[in-house]
């Protein structure tokens, strides 16, 4: 084995760790969780549910969104503390309040509200910051 190859093989693990530091450091910053719950005006309509999910999906490209998940109530055991009366939820992670403000005023978000708000009868939002 040549000396340069041996040096490379010895240095490779350290290089991999060093390359991952910025990504890890970014993930350790305190972020904002924006969790939105939607109740349909017509809860029995599968068509309305699918339209709302389609609409929520359009929010994914907003640049300040770091994580994006759409969900429906899970079929967990019924307990007094569980509210599964909503139709769809949107879970997003955003870097900070400034990024959240960009998200709220972004043309994609405003278009979503304009185009799909006729589908929901109630929306509840829970915003929280990492501690």
Locations of regions flagged by a protein language model:
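Short amphipathic alpha-helical segments
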Residues: 44-70, 107-119
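Hydrophobic h-region of N-terminal signal peptides that target proteins for export
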Residues: 16-22
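Surface-exposed, polar helix/loop patches in the mature regions of secreted/periplasmic/lumenal proteins
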Residues: 91-131
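Short, well-ordered beta-strand segments in beta-rich or mixed alpha/beta enzyme
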Residues: 32-40, 77-104
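N-terminal secretory signal peptides and thylakoid transit peptides that target proteins
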Residues: 1-16
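Short, glycine- and small/hydrophobic-rich beta-strand elements in well-ordered beta-sheets
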Residues: 23-26, 57-87, 118, 125-130
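C-terminal segment of N-terminal export signals and the immediately downstream linker at the start
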Residues: 23-47
